[in-house]
């Protein structure tokens, strides 16, 4: 419901980079894509906007979801933004309300295995490094650094 307003904000600040968290919270629980899909596509028209593949499990039926429940939503995001403007995110610790950390991250990590290497590298680290102006890890290239989440 915030995407139309977000598009107005982005239009006003064309030089400001923006990240859409949690795919802008589509209605995964209800298996709906509209109007989210159309609104997201309009926002993706702005080159200064990226989208995070995160927060999906809390939009699904808690602890009852399957990885493939999220594929069509990730397909829509990749089609709208392109892999160069999509990044992985964890939504930790909130994601643990609906699944464990490893399973939550595994949704995106497993999904991107079907993509070409360059797209995988962008989603799993490259887009994030460019957006935040940081260098990818020298040990892993643009792959994310694996670590245990910090305890609260």
Model-identified regions with their sequence ranges:
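Short Gly/Pro-enriched loop/turn and capping motifs at secondary-structure junctions
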Residues: 57-58, 92-95
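Divalent metal-coordination and catalytic microenvironments
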Residues: 22, 51, 91, 120, ...
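Catalytic pocket-lining loop regions of alpha/beta-barrel enzymes
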Residues: 1-87, 135-142, 146-152
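Mid-to-C-terminal alpha-helical segments outside catalytic/metal-binding sites
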Residues: 76, 80-87, 96-152
């Amino acid at each position: 419901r915030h995407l139309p307003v977000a598009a107005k904000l982005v239009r006003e600040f064309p030089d400001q980079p923006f990240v859409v968290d949690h795919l802008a919270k589509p209605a995964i629980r209800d298996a709906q894509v509209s109007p989210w899909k159309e609104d997201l596509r309009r926002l993706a028209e702005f080159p200064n906007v990226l989208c995070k593949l995160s927060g999906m499990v809390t939009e699904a039926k808690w602890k009852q979801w399957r990885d493939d429940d999220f594929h069509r939503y990730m397909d829509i995001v990749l089609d709208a933004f392109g892999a160069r403007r999509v990044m992985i995110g964890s939504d930790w610790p909130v994601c643990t309300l609906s699944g464990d950390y490893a399973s939550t991250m595994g949704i995106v990590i497993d999904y991107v295995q079907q993509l070409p290497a360059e797209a995988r590298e962008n989603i799993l680290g490259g887009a994030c490094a460019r957006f935040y102006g940081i260098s990818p890890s020298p040990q892993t290239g643009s792959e994310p650094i694996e670590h245990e989440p910090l305890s609260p």
